[in-house]
């Protein structure tokens, strides 16, 4: 299964970020806790050289808690500051401001030596489409100050948000990178909704997810749909279609509808807490 999505506006957005990076002290990078490595744009490391770095494991309430901790340890070992958050319900948000101060302590000390007081920390908020940047900013700022959407590609243009916490945030559009060298990355991103569904083969993607869940979260499909997980992935999708009454005319099974139900249940956490890539040991 080949997955690629890099619309033209992302090239423009990347160029703008290259200019804006000169203005900031800290990069706050949101990643999807269900796919922490796959949801990191490799271009950010190049853009963010010599900048303090904070990774937010967002949507952590949807991800396997053991893997949340494993990924936190992994990124900390790479030199990042890391906080587990869920920007929708505010979980983990209280810790962020203290971590920002810690990440920028050298900048704060530099300002102090120069006699500069209370200059706000300027942070750029980055992440791939649909990772939850706008929701994070709204929750962190405590007011509706950035556009919100549940589809990739909603936030456009440049937005600075001044916070009372002595921090200025620069929101940026969600951008991917031109080519996924590893197709598994594209597939994982498609599963969590960071690539538009309407350019994907959702039935083929559903078969991938079924195979992954049977291997790594055995029994979770059986419990959710009251079906057997035995047989091929196609047979399991058929069982889900029957269990949820996904039928066309003449009693033909509606695989497309069953696939959408599967992804709605996965993405919303109705199946339970699931991580699609595990931290390296």
How should each PLM-predicted stretch be described?
Residues 61-126, 145:
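Canonical P-loop GTPase G-domain recognition
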Residues 87, 137, 167-170:
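Conserved active-site beta-strand-loop modules that form the wall/rim of enzyme catalytic pockets
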Residues 107-111, 144-150, 216-220:
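Short, structured loop/turn "capping" segments at alpha-beta junctions
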Residues 95, 99, 135, 208, ...:
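Alpha-helical scaffold segments in soluble metabolic enzymes
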Residues 122-142, 147, 172:
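Glycine-rich phosphate-binding P-loop
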Residues 44-46, 72, 141:
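Short, solvent-exposed amphipathic alpha-helical segments in soluble enzyme
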Residues 1-27, 33-43, 47-53, 60, ...:
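Helix-rich effector regions associated with P-loop NTPase G domains
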